[in-house]
């Protein structure tokens, strides 16, 4: 058999398919493997380049292949699909991976270490617990409304609602027992979320990068942890604009015939990162519209000319570029390096009215909601 220079491997729970080519791009290896035989098979091969789709379990297999001396690379599945010639089966997928990884401009996903995977799991478990709590509180409100018991918005009103339910003598005994079960579930979820936040705070204190990123306005500890955990290799991006585009904060491009047509942001990439940056930027824009803080002249100008949501996205895009620079340079955030800083006068900053499409007076801006 000729020397194998590249192998594409399609993974699954139990059955793996490998496709290898030689120096003249001729297929020399087509083999189906059971899960338990994968590592033994690659242990017998000479070190080569192995490509996998960046799906479930891919980071584990990349670590194991690197331990055996191979060069393991992960490819985004959406970049592999165009190379599938015909049909949908494991052999065709493995061949497509092998072909896609040979492209000189192919983008790869950095493989995560076990520690990075555990840290990302911390974020995932937190999100899952918060979703379960939201689902449970909605159920409690819905069931309580059927008995004429309602509560105002917000988590702070859930426990008083449960206390009213417990003391309501008009409720059937069966309903009280079921509400007691829901109350126990809510208390358990509340405790688990508190413990997760404590773990996240401890991770933030022990991570130098996360602490540096938290110094940037609009980021905060949660956003800094998300960035430090999910951006494993900031050097993979050529510029801050590429990083902002990866998060999905750049506009869609529909240009043709020399005419530039830009639309809404792409919303590509990691939704949690984009949400953290946009929410933080929205809070800053609200403060600027009320005449508070010490914004830069650039931000004041954006708030005057653009609707609040658009200004928030523009600020999030700018902050993403600043964060990328901090990650690749190792510097600390220095707010005085920003040019054109401006302290607005007392009172609200006039901004464009979203409905009327013109500049609104300060009083109207202060009363309007972004």
Segments from the language model and where they lie:
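A detector of single, family-specific signature residues
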Residues: 1-370
